[in-house]
Amino acid sequence: GLMLRSGNDAAVALAIALGGSVEGFAAQMNERAAQLGLAHTHFTNPHGLPAEGHYTSALDLARITCAAYENAAFRRIVQTEYAVIPWTGHEFDRAMRNKNKLLTAYEGANGVKTGYTKAAGRCLVSGAERDGMQLIAVTLNAPDMWRDAAALLDYGFAAYEMREVLSMGEIVGSVPCADAQGGALPVAAATAGRIPLKAGEEPFLRLILPESVSSPVAQGQFLGYAILGTGEEELARVPLRAAAQAVRPRWTYGRSLQRVLAHWFAADDSQRE
């Protein structure tokens, strides 16, 4: 009812259930907006009807959608063309059809949401996926929003292609570890890293890893991330895992004596200098 039929009553009901009140839920929305780095968004209600202090931008809507697309249930709902739900108090169920015409008119369309108010005009957040590349297009106050959205998506698919920057299992670096073979643990990409790039565009790869690790470390243990992107923009994060193990040496009398003697001789040599 909320996403397929733009149910404002459903939005209010969900807000009260999750936030205790419309105002409480709006505060949660603004907190999440801050986490996403949305500089041009502020919410005062859950349904989007005009209100003082309630605003957003096309870029922020695209970022919100990218975050929402990480939720499998959201992705499933926004690409549902038709649904039948129980209708309390009636002998028959209620049918709901998605208002997003692109779902049946545009190749690869998989969302997202229509919207209209007199103040904002006809608005559409649209999404489509082809060859593993997901695009989001946002049109605001667009009388011909279907054609405009299709044109934006067409441009995106023509101008960009998905490129594999990292292969699954590829060694990208190492982390110092005293008990690892050679004194360092090799680090590998846990998944393939693919990002959309224009022709001739070169990506960057930055590693987020600890300065060192202590044993024991299991092979496959999470150690950090590889950041992929272009310019200054981060486009993807690939988990990094240990490509080998580091086992803590077992304590033995001989090993302990060896360490004590090594420390003693090192101290003695320093006193002679």
Per-range role (PLM):
Residues 38-39, 50-55, 59-273:
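Domain-terminus/edge residues, biased toward the C-terminal soluble/receptor-binding domains
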Residues 1-59, 63-72:
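Active-site-adjacent loops and short helices of periplasmic peptidoglycan-processing enzymes
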